[in-house]
Amino acid sequence: MIQTLTDLSALRALVNGWKREGLRVALVPTMGNLHAGHYSLVMLARQYADRVVSSVFVNPTQFGPNEDFARYPRTPEADLRGLEDAGCDALWLPDVDTMYPLGTALATPIHAPGVSDVLEGECRPGHFDGVCTVVARLFNQVQPDVAAFGKKDYQQLAVIRQMVADLAFPIEILGGSIVREADGLAMSSRNQYLSAEDRPISATIRKVLLQMRDSYAAGTPRAQVEDAASQALEQAGFRVDYAVVRLPDLSEPGDSYTGARVALIAARLGNTRLIDNLEF
């Protein structure tokens, strides 16, 4: 049966007990309102560890002033049931005072230069500083051997990998595959904001990503691929933040480059901001 913890000393006692038994511990950080994508991360983590801790904490420092912190959906009972079914051993539920004992205004910030300054970093200034700051705290609290993050947030995964390498966290970072709805829409806690009229249109993002991959593979210059993607999304009713092709480190590839790439899209449909990507 899953254990629910709200006290940091109790969490550390539990994890230390596991480690004394020689068990590997994994962490799956979340903000709650969980879905099949989150549960797939628990199952992925289980393949690399003997015990899995998931955290649920809606982190105020990664939301901008006009973003949806106050209305971010919170579904604790459903989250607990789903985590238990997925094989999670412990649920860590810190409050804001536990996570930020000196208050958010005095929180020691962490910034990952370069990778956090482009794309999402330009659209949501300070977002990745908040992500790094809370993830580093979760790493210190849980002391995991392994941590799993979803590839839907591709840039976030890259930012965390850079932070882990730079700060020498002894933690293996796993990237979990994107889990999609039947029509291709990437699962997200924010999908429930979509109106009934917008929900069928939202799957256009996946179709455009596939078109970007195929067009790029056919030799179309990158700038043309990106312009065509933005136009297709706008014609479908989206307001586009970006539709780009990048290298895995998020730098820009030359048109003659034939190695691994990723197409990334961020766009708004109605009041809902959606992100997705496709590696190829």
From Swiss-Prot:
GO terms for cellular component: cytosol. The keyword Ligase applies. ATP binds at residues 31-38, 150-153, 179, 187-190. It holds the Pfam family Pantoate_ligase. GO terms for biological process: pantothenate biosynthetic process. One of its GO terms (molecular function) is pantoate-beta-alanine ligase activity. Beta-alanine binds at Q62. CDD domains: PanC. The keyword DNA-binding does not apply. The active site is at H38. Pathway: Cofactor biosynthesis; (R)-pantothenate biosynthesis; (R)-pantothenate from (R)-pantoate and beta-alanine: step 1/1. Its main location: cytoplasm. It catalyses: (R)-pantoate + beta-alanine + ATP = (R)-pantothenate + AMP + diphosphate + H(+). Belongs to the pantothenate synthetase family. PANTHER family: CYTIDYLATE KINASE/PANTOATE-BETA-ALANINE LIGASE, PANTOATE--BETA-ALANINE LIGASE. NCBIfam families: panC. Catalyzes the condensation of pantoate with beta-alanine in an ATP-dependent reaction via a pantoyl-adenylate intermediate. Homodimer. The reaction proceeds by a bi uni uni bi ping pong mechanism. This is Pantothenate synthetase.
